[in-house]
């Protein structure tokens, strides 16, 4: 029992270590102060509020995760398709494994995103509207790198975090992780259309979030594209190399279940083969 708790503490420690970069960078909140050219039209767009706010995005992700994971693991444990040698309750152990893996991948994804944001400091499309430069101090004949912003310091700092999109990377990570979870867990014949339908809406939400970041003038299209790719990459690597979703036991993979349903038994094969 004590050994099991050591493993739990080790898992928690790993998640915390993976979270350190984005925690530290967020607390310091000092991105690279990149300058600009007066004639740069890519940062002259008007400021617009978020279509998908942080609260709305968190609500959708948390709801989808709780509903899919809790119901999926409950059904598999109840039907004895999923079991654990843990000292804890089978359902608790199953939920712990999925959520622990999910949180670890989320920490990695967010840390990678914030490293790029704070180290590169790319200006958002609405930077000049947020900055509100004091043009009397600006020499437009060259590269402007002096501090000339009259806008809110907090908003100006936020306007320096364009590359790459955190909404896109985190949204794609979470939704693709859940889509792969559904692929691994929802593997019965009656779910052949239900499974891709659920996966479509999960991934479509992540892509929609990315589109809104461009239309809201929060990110350049390349910021969103890189964010989506990074989120997808981290989700795939986490599911393939950290989780046990596609291991044969537990649970049985979809391929094994389907093959066992399609293939005739050994005795039936031999009987048919002996006929003249």
From Swiss-Prot:
- Catalysed reaction(s)? a 1,2-diacyl-sn-glycero-3-phosphate + H2O = a 1,2-diacyl-sn-glycerol + phosphate; 1,2-dihexadecanoyl-sn-glycero-3-phosphate + H2O = 1,2-dihexadecanoyl-sn-glycerol + phosphate; 1,2-di-(9Z-octadecenoyl)-sn-glycero-3-phosphate + H2O = 1,2-di-(9Z-octadecenoyl)-sn-glycerol + phosphate; a monoacyl-sn-glycero-3-phosphate + H2O = a monoacylglycerol + phosphate
Q: Which residues lie on this side of the membrane: Cytoplasmic?
A: 1-4, 73-87, 183-189, 247-276
**Compartment annotation:** Membrane; Cell membrane; Early endosome membrane; Endoplasmic reticulum membrane
Q: Which residues of this chain are annotated as glycosylation sites? A: 139, 155
Q: How is its activity regulated?
A: Magnesium-independent phospholipid phosphatase. Insensitive to N-ethylmaleimide.
Phosphatase sequence motif I as annotated region, ranges: 117-125
Q: Which GO terms describe its biological process?
A: ceramide metabolic process; phospholipid dephosphorylation; phospholipid metabolic process; regulation of cell cycle G1/S phase transition; signal transduction; sphingosine metabolic process
Q: Which SUPFAM superfamilies match?
A: Acid phosphatase/Vanadium-dependent haloperoxidase
Query: Which region ranges are annotated with the description Phosphatase sequence motif III?
Result: 212-223
Protein name in UniProt: Phospholipid phosphatase 2
């Amino acid at each position: 029992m004590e050994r099991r708790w050591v493993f739990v503490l080790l898992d928690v420690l790993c998640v915390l270590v993976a979270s350190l970069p984005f925690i530290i960078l967020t607390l310091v909140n000092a991105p690279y102060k990149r300058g600009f050219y007066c004639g740069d039209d890519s940062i002259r767009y008007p400021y617009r509020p978020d279509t998908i706010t942080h609260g709305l995005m968190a609500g959708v992700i948390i709801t989808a995760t709780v509903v899919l994971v809790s119901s999926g693991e409950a059904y598999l444990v109840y039907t004895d398709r999923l079991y654990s040698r843990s000292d804890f309750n089978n359902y608790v152990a199953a939920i712990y494994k999925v959520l622990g893996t999910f949180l670890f991948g989320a920490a990695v994804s967010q840390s990678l995103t914030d490293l790029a944001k704070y180290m590169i400091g790319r200006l958002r499309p609405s930077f000049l509207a947020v900055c509100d430069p004091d043009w009397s101090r600006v020499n437009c004949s060259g590269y402007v790198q002096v501090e000339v912003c009259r806008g809110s310091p907090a908003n100006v700092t936020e306007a320096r975090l364009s590359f790459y999109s955190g909404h896109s990377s985190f949204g794609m990570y979470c939704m693709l992780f859940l889509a792969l979870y559904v692929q691994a867990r929802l593997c019965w014949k009656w779910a052949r259309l239900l499974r891709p339908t659920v996966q479509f809406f999960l991934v479509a939400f992540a892509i929609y979030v990315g589109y809104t970041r461009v239309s809201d003038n929060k990110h350049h299209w390349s910021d969103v594209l890189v964010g989506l790719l990074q989120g997808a990459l981290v989700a795939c690597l986490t599911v393939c190399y950290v989780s046990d979703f596609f291991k044969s036991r537990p649970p049985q993979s979809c391929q094994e279940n389907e093959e066992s349903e399609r293939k005739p038994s050994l005795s039936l094969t031999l009987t048919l083969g002996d006929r003249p």
